[in-house]
Amino acid sequence: FIMPIDSLYKWLDFIGESHEVVTNLKEGTEFDSLDKHILCKKYVVNPPKTSGNSSRQAKQPKGISKLVENQFRFHYDTVLIKKCPWVIKPNDIISITSKVHGTSGISADVLCKRPLRWKDKVASWFTDVPDTKYDYLWSSRKVVKNQYYNKEASAGYYGCDIWGEAHSKLSPYLTKGLTLYYEIIGWLPTGQAIQAMNGKAYDYGYERPVWDPTTQTTPYEYGKNFGIQIYRITYTNPDGVVFEFSARQVQQWCKDKGLIPVEQLYYGYAKKLYPELDETEHWNENFIQKLANDKRFHMEELSPTCHNDVPHEGIVIRIENGLSEAYKLKCFRFLGEESKSLDKGE
């Protein structure tokens, strides 16, 4: 929630508070109350009640974990650029890519724990026996699906392992130490949309899988029913040190492998995007304001690739500085429809 400073002063006058409570705040400070007066709070839809003992803790899967410390890493949280517009400087080289509305996935070929047989344990008394090996891991945004040996991958939120489907398409391109971060878009094997809003699917041009009475199956094909867009690539060495591919390297690697990266909308100096802006006069604020309404990036417009009339989600900005960070700018039109959808319990 963003409140103009003039409106904040009027509110302070209304409740009888001095303006001094905010005059010493630094730019970028986040707060939801002033002197115990609540300004705003996040609206959370109450989830439907479920039967059974809600206090019972979910059983943890048993088995041998594959994970080696500092080898597999989840994706970092993308920061709202409106919270920190000053991070982009006019002379920064930036990448702007389209933000699609799907589900996040990760595929990696990293060092994993190697289960030792009794022969290995005996041999370890006399010589060094490796206890790690390179192996595949795949995950959703927060859950590794094949973390344990001899365990089936979890179906997860959608009731089917869409992440395993995506991983099977990407694993042939993985080399030792490589991790791919991507968005899965389109449809699920069940025929449901990966993402929908107010009853309309974010199909991104993919066809809904249909039951075939001849084969008694529902054919599900990569490139026809669902797609994968890669937005980040890292290399992790045996010591756990991570090398981050630049935005340009991600685009080039995908091109070389015949895979699809996120759509790159702009690459170059930030100042050249809007050369009419004065760098000495509130350049950062004006830059973000221009960006938020730029039709070249489909801002505040319908998705350019979906068959359905659904709002474009927004854009992602990366600064080419070698750091593991990215910034997002969502369309107000998308956020408004998302709020309506959440209110309906979708």
Q: What is the predicted function of each stretch?
A:
Residues 1-346:
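Core nucleotide-handling region used for phosphoryl-transfer chemistry
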